Amino acid sequence: MTICDTVDQYTIMSGDRLKIKDLLCNRLTECGWRNEVRLLCRNILLEKSANNSVSVDQLISEVTPKARTLVPDAVKKELLMKIRTILAETDEDN
């Protein structure tokens, strides 16, 4: 089991996963990331639909790498700090 799997499993069991997910969604909305990704999807669909239809899986595979690079470093750092805080609190409790 990797560190990521362990952290993921712990956050699910402790109930903190939902808090982290909500924080992420809020920050991505606040910084405009969701709108950027929506625009990216729209542009890809317009580009590809001229030739043929695009499946959801094709759209996801094309958008995901680009969308990940658009996540601001500040959001990544904030989430990492939140996860570290949760793990540190757990370590102190044990």
Curated annotation (Swiss-Prot):
It is found in: Nucleus, Nucleoplasm; Cytoplasm. Keywords: Activator, Chromatin regulator, Cytoplasm, mRNA transport, Nucleus, Protein transport, Transcription, Transcription regulation, Translocation, Transport. Signal peptide: none annotated. GO terms for molecular function: chromatin insulator sequence binding; transcription coactivator activity. It comes from the Eukaryota. Its main location: nucleus. GO terms for biological process: chromatin organization; mRNA export from nucleus; positive regulation of transcription by RNA polymerase II; protein transport; transcription elongation by RNA polymerase II. One of its GO terms (cellular component) is transcription export complex 2. InterPro entries: TF_ENY2, TF_EnY2_sf. Component of the nuclear pore complex (NPC)-associated AMEX complex (anchoring and mRNA export complex), composed of at least e(y)2 and xmas-2. Component of the SAGA transcription coactivator-HAT complexes, at least composed of Ada2b, e(y)2, Pcaf/Gcn5, Taf10 and Nipped-A/Trrap. Within the SAGA complex, e(y)2, Sgf11, and not/nonstop form an additional subcomplex of SAGA called the DUB module (deubiquitination module). Component of the THO complex, composed of at least e(y)2, HPR1, THO2, THOC5, THOC6 and THOC7. Interacts with e(y)1. Interacts with su(Hw) (via zinc fingers). HAMAP family: ENY2_Sus1 (MF_03046). Belongs to the ENY2 family. Involved in mRNA export coupled transcription activation by association with both the AMEX and the SAGA complexes. The SAGA complex is a multiprotein complex that activates transcription by remodeling chromatin and mediating histone acetylation and deubiquitination. Within the SAGA complex, participates in a subcomplex that specifically deubiquitinates histone H2B. The SAGA complex is recruited to specific gene promoters by activators, where it is required for transcription. Required for nuclear receptor-mediated transactivation. This is Enhancer of yellow 2 transcription factor. It comes from Drosophila grimshawi (Hawaiian fruit fly).
